[in-house]
Amino acid sequence: MMVQHLKRRPLSRYLKDFKHSQTHCAHCRKLLDRITLVRDGKIVNKIEISRLDTLLDENGWQTEQKSWAALCRFCGDLHCKTQSDFFDIIGFKQFLFEQTEMSPGTVREYVVRLRRLGNHLHEQNISLDQLQDGFLDEILAPWLPTTSTNNYRIALRKYQHYQRQTCTRLVQKSSSLPSSDIY
């Protein structure tokens, strides 16, 4: 009686094949040009991948593969790197993709500006409370970076539009809930 041995390969080899088989970003569905591999929400670079020498058979890979995702570089940065608390960057990105006719490059520009601004405001120790009322571009004017100020103002106005749309949708959802005459 002969025992069948399943072929075992290093995890790094499975990942190389996985990387080449992915055609679209797992988050935004954009056609992939350059890929960021992510395991359980953490970016894994090519040096780390080359060190993954655990031997797996096909069944082991099928289980392991569920932990991995291929993202475009943009989504990798957004979803896996620390963001400031000033802006809902991921929600803003989704809004721009789904509710506007902007090209992916333009969406990327607005998101990058807002993320940089959030980091800048954090470094300046600006309080989140200052973002509550009024027009963001006017409220934050004293703290905007001196270069590309108009670009930051435009991004802030787009973000404020996103906030208004989000609030409107929340109000519409809550008003459509059933209510009782008793209360």
Curated annotation (Swiss-Prot):
It comes from the Bacteria. Disruption phenotype: Not required for motility, disruption leads to derepression of the adhesive curli fimbriae genes. One of its GO terms (biological process) is DNA integration. Induction: Induced in early post-exponential phase, its expression decreases again at OD578 2-2.5. One of its GO terms (molecular function) is core promoter sequence-specific DNA binding. During the post-exponential growth phase transiently interferes with RpoS (sigma S) activity without affecting expression of RpoS itself. It is probably not an anti-sigma factor as its overexpression is detrimental in rapidly growing cells where there is almost no sigma S factor. There is a strong overlap between Crl-activated genes and FliZ-down-regulated genes. FliZ acts as a timing device for expression of the genes for the adhesive curli fimbriae by indirectly decreasing expression of the curli regulator CsgD. This is Regulator of sigma S factor FliZ. The gene is fliZ.
